[in-house]
């Protein structure tokens, strides 16, 4: 008599169930990782504009004259996850795209003329609470306060 080789239906169903459980655990973690990577790209896109606004504010005694395309502030250019960057009177506004679609980040400079220092407030606006929380964690500066919405 020949012996049968292979897997039984029950064994295959158990393997499929294990794979489904591992996928259910791994997929959200992977999606969070991708979201944080996209937010990091957004932060890296904002940094040259932030630095330019700070230098402009030092040179001109405030951020009122620091808009894109003037006084050393570059013209707005997006990236993979940033559809638009605008700088007006020192305030940076970044609009997300792809996995950050619907996210708007505002970075508002707070100029202290007596000390000659600048601090930043940030505001993350989106309808997704998890994306807003991740944005607030990525765009966290030591001197930042969240803007009241």
Give the role of each language-model region.
Residues 24, 32-74:
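Conserved hydrophobic/amphipathic alpha-helical signal-anchor segments
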Residues 1-41, 45:
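N-terminal single-pass transmembrane signal-anchor helix
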Residues 3, 26-29, 45, 52, ...:
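A general marker of short, structured functional hotspots
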């Amino acid at each position: 008599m020949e012996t049968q080789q292979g897997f039984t239906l029950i064994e295959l169903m158990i393997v499929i169930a294990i794979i489904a459980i591992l996928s259910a655990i791994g997929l959200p973690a992977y999606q969070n990782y991708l979201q944080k990577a996209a937010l990091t790209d957004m932060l890296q896109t904002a940094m040259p504009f932030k630095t330019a606004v700070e230098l402009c504010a030092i040179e001109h005694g405030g951020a009122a004259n620091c808009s894109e395309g003037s006084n050393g502030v570059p013209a707005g250019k997006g990236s993979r996850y940033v559809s638009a960057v605008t700088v007006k009177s020192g305030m940076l506004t970044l609009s997300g795209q792809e996995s950050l679609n619907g996210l708007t980040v505002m970075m508002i400079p707070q100029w202290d003329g007596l000390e000659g220092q600048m601090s930043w407030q940030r505001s993350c606006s989106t309808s997704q609470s998890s994306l807003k929380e991740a944005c607030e964690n990525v765009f966290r500066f030591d001197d930042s306060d969240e803007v009241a919405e």
